[in-house]
Amino acid sequence: MKLTSEKLPKNPFYASVSQYAAKNQKFFQWKKEKTDYTHANLVDKALQLLKERILKGDTLAYFLRGQLYFEEGWYEEALEQFEEIKEKDHQATYQLGVMYYDGLGTTLDAEKGVDYMKKILDSPCPKARHLKFAAAYNLGRAYYEGKGVKRSNEEAERLWLIAADNGNPKASVKAQSMLGLYYSTKEPKELEKAFYWHSEACGNGNLESQGALGLMYLYGQGIRQDTEAALQCLREAAERGNVYAQGNLVEYYYKMKFFTKCVAFSKRIADYDEVHDIPMIAQVTDCLPEFIGRGMAMASFYHARCLQLGLGITRDETTAKHYYSKACRLNPALADELHSLLIRQRI
């Protein structure tokens, strides 16, 4: 399973680019006078402002310019900026760790990425403190994936527990969610631990864990079965953009014979573009691409089944084949599993 890096944590002592710019009188006046500005205009103006501050010796402006490049997807420029200040700015060091590990703006070098994250985790400097939980999560990811270090689930678990910090909302919520996923997929499974960590992460706002909790309630995994609680979690997660929760709601509607509702809901999900929408949704929701694809595959399969049998929609076997094929492309293993249920007339 391919995981994703923890985004740069917010530092209460550092302003963001937008906050930094908003406090600048020249920038504020420019926005007031120019009412038809675009995003590109704002970026250009922010870069101009940051350049002026850099020339005046503002050390924070160096990092903020690199971060602006990073957020705009100009990774080569961001890398160059962060490399210049890595010895003076822990946030730059952190971002370099992410960029080398994920190959953003440079050739992928997982070992170098791991080294930068270890520097953050081992740093005694108070200015690195807010980065330590996130660095521990990223190091746990490296051990889990076996990239840059020798693979070790035990070391990954140890680091994620450090990062999760007993459910602290100011720690790595991503690590809390990952522990929920880890305990529910390892052998042997530890479902009560999985439920605990998904509950902690969900309480701290994690969208992936909210959907996972819904499924654990629905099937009585690690907790007593509770359909009402399951549907509440799944619906709220679906409304917030969790595609895997959406796919599982489609399955629930089909099994409950709410075919009209199933068709309407499944079509919207099944029509997501598998190439462009999955990475975009992952970026916006911070959900894992694998589960986004799984949710889309589930919706595609059930939409195809409704079309094939004329359930809640006019029968159309040609279009049904299109959606069956899409389900197979998105997740062959899931499509095969659902096809087996279909053959046994379970769906």
From Swiss-Prot:
<keyword id="KW-0677">Repeat</keyword>
<feature type="repeat" description="Sel1-like 1">
    <location>
        <begin position="93"/>
        <end position="125"/>
    </location>
</feature>
<feature type="repeat" description="Sel1-like 4">
    <location>
        <begin position="207"/>
        <end position="242"/>
    </location>
</feature>
<feature type="repeat" description="Sel1-like 6">
    <location>
        <begin position="297"/>
        <end position="332"/>
    </location>
</feature>
<dbReference type="InterPro" id="IPR011990">
    <property type="entry name" value="TPR-like_helical_dom_sf"/>
</dbReference>
<dbReference type="InterPro" id="IPR006597">
    <property type="entry name" value="Sel1-like"/>
</dbReference>
<feature type="repeat" description="Sel1-like 2">
    <location>
        <begin position="133"/>
        <end position="168"/>
    </location>
</feature>
<feature type="repeat" description="TPR">
    <location>
        <begin position="59"/>
        <end position="92"/>
    </location>
</feature>
<dbReference type="GO" id="GO:0005737">
    <property type="term" value="C:cytoplasm"/>
</dbReference>
<feature type="repeat" description="Sel1-like 3">
    <location>
        <begin position="173"/>
        <end position="206"/>
    </location>
</feature>
<dbReference type="Pfam" id="PF08238">
    <property type="entry name" value="Sel1"/>
</dbReference>
<protein>
    <recommendedName>
        <fullName>LRP2-binding protein</fullName>
    </recommendedName>
</protein>
<dbReference type="InterPro" id="IPR052323">
    <property type="entry name" value="LRP2-binding"/>
</dbReference>
<comment type="subunit">
    <text>Interacts with LRP2.</text>
</comment>
<keyword id="KW-0802">TPR repeat</keyword>
<comment type="function">
    <text>May act as an adapter that regulates LRP2 function.</text>
</comment>
<dbReference type="InterPro" id="IPR019734">
    <property type="entry name" value="TPR_rpt"/>
</dbReference>
<feature type="repeat" description="Sel1-like 5">
    <location>
        <begin position="243"/>
        <end position="277"/>
    </location>
</feature>
<keyword id="KW-0963">Cytoplasm</keyword>
